Amino acid sequence: MTILTHTLGFPRVGLRRELKKAQESYWAGNTTREALLAVGRELRARHWEQQKQAGIDLLPVGDFAWYDHVLTTSLLLGNVPARHQNNDGSVDIDTLFRIGRGRAPTGEPAAAAEMTKWFNTNYHYIVPEFSKGQQFRLTWTQLLEEVDEALALGHKIKPVLLGPVTYLWLGKVKGEPFDRLTLLKDILPVYQHVLAELAKRGVEWVQIDEPALVLELPQAWLDAFKPAYDALAGQVKLLLTTYFEGVTPNLDTIIVLPVQGLHVDLIHGKDDVVELHQRLPVDWLLSAGLINGRNVWRADLTEKYAQINAIVGKRALWVASSCSLLHSPIDLSVETRLDTEVKSWFAFALQKCGELALLRDALNSGETAALEEWSVPIQARRHSHRVHNAAVEKRLAAITAQDSQRENPYEVRAEAQRARFKLPAWPTTTIGSFPQTTEIRGLRLDFKKGNLDANNYRTGIAEHIKQAIIEQERLGLDVLVHGEAERNDMVEYFGEHLDGFVFTQNGWVQSYGSRCVKPPVVIGDISRPAPITVEWAKYAQSLTDKPVKGMLTGPVTILCWSFPREDVTRETIAKQIALALRDEVADLEAAGIGIIQIDEPALREGLPLRRSDWDAYLEWGVEAFRINAAVAKDETQIHTHMCYCEFNDIMDSIAALDADVITIETSRSDMELLESFEAFDYPNEIGPGVYDIHSPNVPSVEWIEALLKKAAQRIPAQRLWVNPDCGLKTRGWPETRAALANMVKAAHNLRQAK
């Protein structure tokens, strides 16, 4: 039995972020829809050919998305919220953009659909909305069109489809409450229709993604898989695909399904290959996810060979990435500035395809010399001086319980802070960043390229900070920020100033829609060689009598939004970062900064997928935050910010952070997230986000007032702050001014109504 290679998906955005640029040009009205569609076609053709040339036997089709693959599935099923529909009921690419962004070049603006994290990754999906009695039909044929494209190019393909049970699991009920699982019978005919169309095109295998099968699902959801797949059986071969965790706990549910193969993630799961082989039906194909799709490290192919070789020849076998390569940068070969030694430790998406081809060839032939050669740099890395720092390891080992305790409890600190800041009721602030204009980006780029000297760069940044302070004072905000003009990304900026990180030139990965991030890579022990944010925070504070917040990204978020080391635990990395940033808090405080925000938007997304594993993670995640913050004096107010979060199941841990103020993203969920804080009787101060910064729509004063009044029904008004959902980096100044002016006006109205 010949072993084949395949990937579960490939990065969409293009090596130079061509998709991002085309999307944003289209949204701005600077290019046509036809030009946008042409960019998509060119990228798909290029990516299929690149994977094929790298040694992939079966190419994924349907992994491309104009915004998000879950949103693509919603359109496929005709699941379009009424507020986003075209008047004639048709569906087009602007429908998709209205759901994801709240507006598009055509159609009326409307509130964007909710966005949240894709399992425990840094990718976001648009949450499907379900209503009682909803109807579904095939309305968006993107998958079929892309299959036709790939077949016309002569490729051997494997279409990719998000499975029906996971799709329903990922959604939310809107309006009258009901069990969304009851919609399964209504969406299955659309899936049957799609599979029939694929069969007509001669497709043999379809990858049907059911990552919900790695979760601790309620029994009713587990029971839904059998009737669902009974309905889908018989038209094509189905590769039931899971990732991000192991499947052994749910294997009894899986092995009775009428599918022809199973993909398992052998990186993040703890499944034993031999046990899987013994328990799976004998005629099933096993797709082994042996190459990590979520990190950038070169694989130890000798180890992978040993892991899978025991079942070679005993059943049909494919080798694959653990998950979609969407989460990896595209091509290491274009990284010309990386140190040669460090570069030899990495593999990006195309190199991972090459790793699969090497592994396939070795497993088919029994010859392992090429694998041994590939793995040589991995052995060298284990002993590199770049990896180990004795001083950091010693400091980490010396941490005591006292290092994570503030001097006094919140009630005492709050009195000291009220006396220091004398803020009005409903204090207004922003989350940190202001619009990253063309001028700001150009300034940073010129400096990075050496076209601008340090003095002129600093003068330029200082001017942008000054303008941000002037804008905020003009708007009447109570607590100001410096605007972060000097920062390209909230994680990358800190990584650039901490030892133990390296950076890529083109290591972009998609976060959502057109937003891409370039995560730093943790290659060794982490320390802070010098203050990072103090100079600019101190300068901003010198420009105003109002308090200016110091802005830090928290240790868990830096960990979650970086590519981590694989030779130490995540806890070790987080606590090393916490110790480095603890020194930054002390330096900010010494420089006269009285309010310091430590953002932890990723705290919840870092949760293990299985609830039984949560406690251990939350214990060290909370401890890392507290180590970072606990050096602050009582009169220094510590803020934290979180977004895309469901809080009700981790409220104990949110409270345990002991931040004086927490700002959260609530506008897209209509303040429903505050239910968790109300039920828990959360004791500290809260800033519920009053408008969605991911949409360019400007909220009215009345809209914001209504949200704040709703918030005050749950949280005492004296503990409420007024702020946007998130940072304003991606917005333009006109909409930012308008939205913040309305926000400040709403706060003033509520003060007067007191």
UniProtKB/Swiss-Prot annotation:
Keyword Translocase: no
Residues annotated to bind L-methionine: 431-433, 484, 599
Catalytic activity from the UniProt record: 5-methyltetrahydropteroyltri-L-glutamate + L-homocysteine = tetrahydropteroyltri-L-glutamate + L-methionine
Cofactor comment text: Binds 1 zinc ion per subunit.
EC number of this enzyme: 2.1.1.14
A GO BP entry: methionine biosynthetic process
Transmembrane as UniProt keyword: no
Protein's recorded name: 5-methyltetrahydropteroyltriglutamate--homocysteine methyltransferase
Originating species: Salmonella typhi
